[in-house]
Design a protein with these regions (language model features):
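Non-catalytic, surface beta->alpha helical segment in thiol-disulfide oxidoreductase systems
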Residues: 97-136
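Short pre-active-site segment immediately N-terminal to redox-active cysteine/selenocysteine motifs
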Residues: 39-42
Length: 145
């Protein structure tokens, strides 16, 4: 009986000892990263990201990743994208599709997105998540730039 009690106490101590270490290394499972994804019809790079990268990220992060997609198809939408980009520090020359915004971070193109998106999502989750970008505010802020 004494031996069983000792094993039980040691087991509880081990579990209690490992739990804080796991919490520090892991991410908050309730954290959510909201992203804005901009794409254009007929853009092969956009298709690549939409068909390959985003499904992989969704499979990896599940409900902790919410991606809102925005098609850029009209002149007004292109101008709005330029304004949003300007407010985030990008020039017109640096702006393009596909583009993903998470927090104040912007990834552009089919090279940046696959290589940097997983780390950006992980970092945002460790920081407690990322709110959806306020695109109206960003467009207004970038209108004067």
């Amino acid at each position: 009986m004494r031996r069983i009690l000792l094993v039980l106490i040691l087991s509880l101590l081990c579990l209690a000892g490992f739990q804080p270490a796991l919490a520090q290394q892991g991410t908050d499972v309730s954290a959510v990263v909201n992203a804005a994804f901009f794409w254009m019809e007929g853009c092969p790079y956009c298709e690549e990201v939409m068909q390959t990268v985003l499904p992989e990220m969704q499979a990896q992060f599940g409900d902790q990743l919410v991606v809102q997609s925005f098609e850029v198809g009209t002149t007004d939408e292109v101008n709005r994208l330029y304004q949003i980009s300007a407010s985030l520090g990008l020039s017109k020359e640096e702006t393009g599709v596909p583009m993903i915004i998470i927090g104040d971070q912007v990834l552009v193109g089919s090279e940046q997105i696959p290589t940097r998106l997983p780390g950006l999502i992980e970092a945002a989750l460790q920081d407690g998540g990322a709110e959806a970008p306020d695109l109206d505010r960003l467009a207004t802020a970038g209108a004067g730039a």
